[in-house]
Design a protein with these regions (language model features):
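Short acidic/polar active-site loop segments enriched in Thr and Asp
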Residues: 16, 62, 137, 196-199, ...
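Bacterial carbohydrate/catabolite-sensing allosteric modules
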Residues: 44, 103-113, 155-162, 167-356
Length: 356
């Protein structure tokens, strides 16, 4: 079956081709009711706009795509906000994605492909994600980047690999890391090897599947050790950044005023843990003598901070490399059964938990 075209969308939605084009190129210029009708027709048909006005099924581009979430719209950001963001360099997703990008670039070059990268600002076929999908032969998407219904549309026309998080669409190839196993081993290390009993966990939003999996691993370790098992993280961060690490650490210390502090704080990622180190130093709390601190991810900065950060290292570059391999395999054999990979993680012992 041939790929649906702009003509099909126009006919189904009862508008002109020019109107369909405006919906994708300048959506604010089209009345909301008309825009919704066009987008609904596009979803129903499985239409993905091609940036080069070419049918996705007709030829290859020699390009693979990666899309990861972006939590700030650069078009709405003021100059002052942009300058502050650049100075802080505090985006956990950017640091995490950078390692995945490096892995994808290396593997793509081996196969003679270029890599096109996009930060998703919004869902829907009119979004940047769909525009990128029209320019690539295959697409890797980080969890929570594209709404499931929109991803279903895109995946009808080109191979898609989901990275991180649980498998949400059964027919798509999928790669994740052993988040729960890694956090469980980290908590066991603090309990068994350092004799720590009063632990606190700072997680992310419930919508973050990786952060939730890490919390479950923490719960399992506490249960095994006969420690109290919390139903919820001690605190949740709205965004897993250094700033949120500082804020949540201050909140935990304030909450413990007049009673025993936690002996260790486990953070759902490295960026928050690094923010915690800043907060604890500011408040005169010694790490690890007074409170141990741990993270998760193994970003390069975790080696540089003082004290160096104990963390769970996930193979971020390998995640990118495996994504390319799955896309290449899917392009060669579109009908093969979907693949789901679980990549192992490793515990990195450093000074922030008391290891030499």
């Amino acid at each position: 079956m041939s790929a649906p075209t702009v003509y099909d969308v126009a006919e189904r939605s009862g508008v002109s081709i020019a109107t369909v084009s405006r919906v994708y190129r300048n959506p604010d210029s089209v009345r909301a009711q008309t825009r919704d009708r066009v987008l609904e027709a596009a979803r129903a048909l499985g239409y993905v706009p091609s940036g080069n006005a070419r049918g996705l099924a007709s030829r290859t581009t020699g390009v693979l795509g990666l899309c990861f979430p972006d939590y700030a719209d650069p078009d709405a950001e003021t100059d002052a906000e942009a300058e502050a963001d650049a100075e802080a360099d505090d985006s956990a997703v950017m640091l995490y994605s950078d390692q995945i990008i490096r892995g994808m670039e290396r593997a793509a070059r081996r196969h003679g492909y270029a890599l096109l990268i996009a930060a998703s600002l919004a869902g829907g076929p009119e979004s940047l994600v769909a525009k990128v999908a029209g320019r690539v032969d295959g697409f890797a998407v980080l969890a929570r980047t594209v709404p499931t219904e929109d991803l279903e549309v895109i995946s009808r026309r080109l191979p898609v690999v989901m990275l991180a998080g649980p498998r949400e669409i059964d027919h798509l190839d999928h790669i994740e890391v052993a988040n729960s196993d890694g956090e469980r081993e980290l908590a066991r290390h603090l309990i068994r090897d350092h004799g720590l009993r009063r632990l606190a966990f700072v997680g992310g939003l419930r919508e973050s599947p990786d952060a939730e999996a890490r919390f479950r691993g923490y719960q399992e370790a506490c249960r095994e050790a006969g420690l109290p098992v919390a139903d919820e993280p001690d605190l949740r961060a709205e965004m897993m950044t250094q700033a949120e690490g500082e804020r949540t650490t201050d909140a935990l210390l304030d909450r413990a005023a007049g009673r025993e502090r936690p002996q260790a704080i486990l953070f759902a990622n490295d960026q928050m843990a690094i923010g915690a180190l800043h907060a604890l130093e500011r408040r005169g709390v010694r790490v690890p003598e007074d409170i141990a601190v741990t993270g998760f991810d193994g970003i390069p900065m975790s080696r540089i901070v003082r004290p160096s950060l104990t963390t769970v290292r996930q193979p971020m570059r390998r995640l990118g490399e495996e994504a390319v391999e799955l896309l290449i395999q899917r392009l060669a054999d579109p009908t093969r059964d979907p693949v789901s990979l679980m990549l192992p993680v490793s515990l990195t012992h450093r000074a922030s938990c008391g290891c030499p």
